[in-house]
């Protein structure tokens, strides 16, 4: 009988020792999962080069390589010509266009287009200089330009909004993963106010893929 009690005591001691060793791990709070934006009704994920974005499901991606001329014309509304301080934003478009397409629900005569461009050369340029460059491009039409700094989580974005006569656009500029990003929505001025919240939502939803570390 005494032998049985001794064995039971030894077993309990071993069990307590094992439990004590594992206790820190059991008490550890698991790391919360990384939040992923949940699409609102009618919004879907679109994949681009090094990024993804939530847009209305009526958007349709186009082949940027087949439409470089149209992309250049679109981008020059924001950048200006080759004498602009930020003209290098139009360089290497074939590799720097991250997404290009349009909203098929908009009238064909005045489509809403979306162009997303990334650029490494301009990543070090201060946003203040980009603001000055945009004003320089617009010249006497600067009065039709509105500039605002927005914060979407950890992302600080400068939004340029321009509308005059039949020309309108909202451009979102920010820096992430060693690149300057420009998200440019082209739409008639009458549509800017109605779509602004959707544009903001889409830019806030963007997920930028980490850039690969160069191999030494």
Regions found by a protein language model. Name each.
Residues 101-102, 106, 110-177:
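Signature of long, low-cysteine stretches enriched in small and polar/charged residues
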Residues 159, 181-184:
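Structural recognition of the beta-strand scaffold that forms the well-ordered cores
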Residues 2-96, 100, 148-152, 165-166, ...:
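N-terminal targeting sequences that direct proteins away from the cytosol to non-cytosolic compartments
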Residues 118-120, 184-187:
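Short, histidine-centered active-site or binding-site loop motifs used for metal coordination
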């Amino acid at each position: 009988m005494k032998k049985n009690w001794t064995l039971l005591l030894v077993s309990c001691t071993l069990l307590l020792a094992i439990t004590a060793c594992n206790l820190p791990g059991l008490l550890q709070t698991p790391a919360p999962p990384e939040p992923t934006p949940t699409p609102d009704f009618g919004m879907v994920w679109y994949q681009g080069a090094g990024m993804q974005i939530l847009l209305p499901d009526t958007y349709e991606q186009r082949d940027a390589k087949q439409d470089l001329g149209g992309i250049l014309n679109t981008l020059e509304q924001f950048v200006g010509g080759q004498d602009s301080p930020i003209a290098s934003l139009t360089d290497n478009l074939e590799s720097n266009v991250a997404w290009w397409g349009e909203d098929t629900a908009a009238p064909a005569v005045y489509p809403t287009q979306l162009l997303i461009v990334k650029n490494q050369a301009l990543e070090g340029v201060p946003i203040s200089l980009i603001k000055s460059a945009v004003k320089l491009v617009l010249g006497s039409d600067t009065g039709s330009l509105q500039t605002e700094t927005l914060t979407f989580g950890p992302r600080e974005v400068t939004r340029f909004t321009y509308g005059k006569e039949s020309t309108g656009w909202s451009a979102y500029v920010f820096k992430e993963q060693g690149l300057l990003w420009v998200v440019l929505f082209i739409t008639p001025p009458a549509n800017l106010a109605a779509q602004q919240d959707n544009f903001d939502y889409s830019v806030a939803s963007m997920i930028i893929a980490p850039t690969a570390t160069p191999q030494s």
